[in-house]
Amino acid sequence: MLLLKISVYAVVIFFVGLFVFGFLSNDPARNPNRRDME
């Protein structure tokens, strides 16, 4: 049961980090070469 809980937390943290990374990467001021991804 502990392993399952750790796995769930790992997946949640992974998706949150992916969302934050994607949000920062889509910022035109930080990465203007990604305008075609919008």
Swiss-Prot record:
Keywords: Membrane, Photosynthesis, Photosystem II, Reaction center, Thylakoid, Transmembrane, Transmembrane helix. It comes from the Bacteria. One of its GO terms (biological process) is photosynthesis. Pfam families: PsbI. Its main location: membrane. The keyword Nucleotidyltransferase does not apply. One of its GO terms (cellular component) is plasma membrane-derived thylakoid membrane. It is found in: Cellular thylakoid membrane. InterPro entries: PSII_PsbI (IPR003686), PSII_PsbI_sf (IPR037271). It is a single-pass membrane protein. The chain crosses the membrane at residues 1-21. One of the components of the core complex of photosystem II (PSII), required for its stability and/or assembly. PSII is a light-driven water:plastoquinone oxidoreductase that uses light energy to abstract electrons from H(2)O, generating O(2) and a proton gradient subsequently used for ATP formation. It consists of a core antenna complex that captures photons, and an electron transfer chain that converts photonic excitation into a charge separation. PSII is composed of 1 copy each of membrane proteins PsbA, PsbB, PsbC, PsbD, PsbE, PsbF, PsbH, PsbI, PsbJ, PsbK, PsbL, PsbM, PsbT, PsbX, PsbY, PsbZ, Psb30/Ycf12, peripheral proteins PsbO, CyanoQ (PsbQ), PsbU, PsbV and a large number of cofactors. It forms dimeric complexes. Belongs to the PsbI family. This is Photosystem II reaction center protein I. It comes from Synechococcus sp. (strain JA-3-3Ab). The lineage of its organism: Bacteria, Bacillati, Cyanobacteriota, Cyanophyceae, Synechococcales.
